[in-house]
Regions:
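Amphipathic, soluble alpha-helical interaction motifs
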Residues: 18, 22, 45, 49-52
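Arg/Lys-rich, positively charged N-terminal/basic patches that mediate binding to nucleic acids
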Residues: 1-38
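Residue-level signal for pocket-adjacent positions within structured domains
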Residues: 1, 54, 94
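Short, hydrophobic secondary-structure boundary micro-motifs
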Residues: 32, 54-58, 101
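Basic/aromatic recognition patch in beta-strand/loop cores that engages polyanionic ligands
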Residues: 48-86
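Compact soluble domain cores
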Residues: 40-42
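Enriched for short, Lys/Arg-rich terminal
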Residues: 71-110
Length: 110
């Protein structure tokens, strides 16, 4: 088994920050901390098993190679791409968001 490193894009980092702030304000510190723990656990799992996510059809997003994986206890999905030696985290988004090519476009991450 190849263990890969996690390489979060700045948008993924901002997503996590925004979600933690939202949960802290809405439901309290304990819920926000539980979200942070779940993100850490999800990243650890993706490091060891990067293929656990589901491919997002190219017709849907017009971007090849993007996978998504839903968190267990929170209604968010991690969007990522497997590289040779690492997993690129693109975004962490609520499924009610309009997840389009513009949301995940590679040009946004350049």
């Amino acid at each position: 088994m190849t263990v890969r490193t996690i390489a979060p894009h700045r948008h993924a980092i901002a997503d996590v920050h925004d979600i933690i702030c939202y949960y802290r304000e809405l439901a309290g510190t304990a819920v926000a901390e539980n979200f942070a723990i779940e993100i850490d656990e999800a990243c650890a799992r993706l490091r060891q098993h990067p293929n656990i996510g589901f491919p997002r059809p190219a017709l849907e997003l017009d971007i090849e190679g993007i996978k998504s994986w839903a968190l267990k206890r929170f209604p968010h999905q991690i969007f990522y791409e497997i590289q040779n030696d690492h997993v690129e985290l693109w975004r962490i988004l609520h499924p009610r968001r309009d997840i389009t090519q513009a949301t995940l476009s590679r040009q946004r991450f350049q």
